[in-house]
Amino acid sequence: SLMVSAASVASAGPIDQARQLYNDGDYEAVVEKMRPVVKRSPRDGNANYFLGASLYALGQLDEAVKPLETAEGRGVADAARILAIMALDRYDASDASKHIDAWAAALTKSKKPKSEEFEFISRRAIQLGNMLDRVECIEVIDSINVDSATFFEVYRLSSAAGSLLPPDAVSRLGAGGDANELSVAYMPENRSELLWAAADTSGCFNLYGADILDDGSIDHSTILDDALREGGSAQFPFLMPDGVTLYFANNGENSLGGYDIFMTRRSDGDGEGKEYFQPQNVGMPYNSPYNDFMMAIDEASGLGWWATDRNQIPGKVTVYVFIPSQMRVNVEPDNPNLADIARLSSIALTQKEGVDYAEMLRTHLPGRNDAGVTQSASSPAFALDMG
């Protein structure tokens, strides 16, 4: 069948050949075939599209822009789609909106309906613009690239901040459930309750909680609040020592993309009587179009932590260490480094001159990682499935 496919590609015209090769994922072959076509016919929309789209797929972003813009100008809807995505990845909301408008015009002209992807990217552009208006000033003092399977082990929390537990801890402590379907669990210092995430029959994750009784046994578990998922999945709970403020991650309708970190507060009721308020997206630079999760703030050490796969390192996530603020202060909207601060292209942009952050880390970190108390060599590996 490969010989038949190759023969059919060879007998087709250059654009049909490019389309077939592109659909097969052979982007280098598309680039090789389309370069001379674009040179001969620089205004050919389809040739420019396949050249630009293949360069984009190969990660040659700068070179992809010109042919994609030419194709967009010729009314190729998919060229405008890719340019909109590229603008979102650069945190350029206004440029993204421009390409979304061109995308919409091309779809209208060709009498094609707007897809779910169109609606999703349009929402993301609006949300990105709103988030860029309120990027928080924080000091990121360190970043650590670690294996995604055990990322939580590098959170050096003091005992007052509670403990992050490996996924099998929930079943080992008697709360039931399949360890393979559990997220990192959280237990406060007083060991009064356990919070975790588990998948339901639809494959979506909900946050669960259970009280720990005086004899150390686990009371029956309950879903904290189905609304915390916001139509997606909710995972990675962390409860502040006030017993009210809950950080977690969801990938629902108010996420910029993938998992975003959210904050909610709960009432002082007991067990199933607790009510959770509308979750608030904590914004940038914590969140990104990628997966951002497991916010933990240690008031005793004055340090905070969160994890992200925004740097797209295979098998790894980046854990950022930062100094939490008592009061939120946002970066000035006209700051020329706004987008770079928002996406943390360099943590140095968040730091103050003359501060010895290495010394701050040395003096502020607890002497041990409390999460390590509950871990053992027999603990199963935690596969971070962000789907």
Where in this protein do the model-derived segments appear?
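Structural motif corresponding to the intra-repeat A-B loop/turn of tetratricopeptide repeats
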Residues: 24, 58, 90-91
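Alpha-helical segment of the N-proximal tetratricopeptide repeat
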Residues: 13-41
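Short, conserved micro-motifs composed of acidic
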Residues: 82, 89, 93-95, 106-387
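Short coil turns that delineate tetratricopeptide repeat
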Residues: 42, 74-76, 108
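Start-of-helix register in tetratricopeptide repeats
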Residues: 46, 78-80
